[in-house]
Amino acid sequence: MGFIDDELQEVSKLCHNVVEGSRLVSCVRTMVRVEITKTKFKTIIVCIQFSEDYPRTPLLIELKSKTLSVKLLDGLAEVCEKECKKFLGKAQVLQILKFVRNFIDENPLICCYDEISTIKKTLENEDELKLKQKYSCIGLKVQRGLYYFKAKIEVPDNYPTACVKLEDADTNFPPLFRRYFLAQGKELARKCVEPPLKKKSQAPFTPSPSLNTVTSFLVKSVKTLPQEHCQSCRQMCLPPNPENAETNENADMHIERLYCGHLFHLHCLVTYMKTPPFHGGKKCPTCKQRIYHEKWGLTDKLAEARWAHQQARARELAETQEIYSVQHSITDNEEDIVVSFIFCI
């Protein structure tokens, strides 16, 4: 038997034991085909052909996958061919299979390669995106002016079947927005992997990647919130310096976020909710969606009744003051008449 036949025999005997998660599909002179699997979404099919002058020349390698990025696979195939040159004159097949398996183990973020590429395009110069392959997480920092939000995004091993998680969050936005970033990010991630309670269609639910969904939300929020205006007074909600932002959640100038996403000062929101029109519920001046807020639980009928009562009270006070003014004027006139009469005597 020749060199290639000996190597093929060695591959067929040792592949399963030497390369973890491998399945030998074919092992003949025309092609060696091996499927290497760590998870359902981290599977690479290695297709190997022998060159004419093998083993004096490197193997011809093609990588395939149903879930991983084509661009990633093309780049890895080039690296594999360079790796083959280290073993010229020797058996190369098992060495390359072990190299591919090692690449999968050491780069757990390969399952979100395309998402990471998309995220990088949305970031600006002051933003940061750091890949930490060893810990299967991404360090994200988004900034607008002096405001920032940074967090560690953990990517689970069975991603995208399981969703990403936000950890170690830090920001200089007021506490209200920190809670919003984390809660909404968690909810968006959950929706990507859990079916809705009320299905709109009969189609089976399929989990979708959550990294880009969560990150895009965080980037958009941090970039736009410092430039938002109060929907009532139209003044900037957040001051240019985060240190001057109101953090007392009962203060008049504290920022309140509606479910539609628009912002109000607390004082402006209360004033707006207490004044007509009330029919059909109070609506956001910008998007016309009905306003729901945890600090305002009155129905439109009760709010209208209270407003009418306040107006009636105001009219009563005005009438009382007017009567008092008339009586006071009459008394003053009577005193003037008495004084004039005395002087005349």
Regions found by a protein language model. Give the residues of each.
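PEST-like intrinsically disordered, low-complexity C-terminal regions enriched in Ser/Thr/Pro
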Residues: 302-345
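Short, low-complexity Ser/Thr-rich regulatory SLiMs
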Residues: 50-52, 155-157, 275
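Glycine-centered motif in EGF-like
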Residues: 1-34, 54-140, 159-229
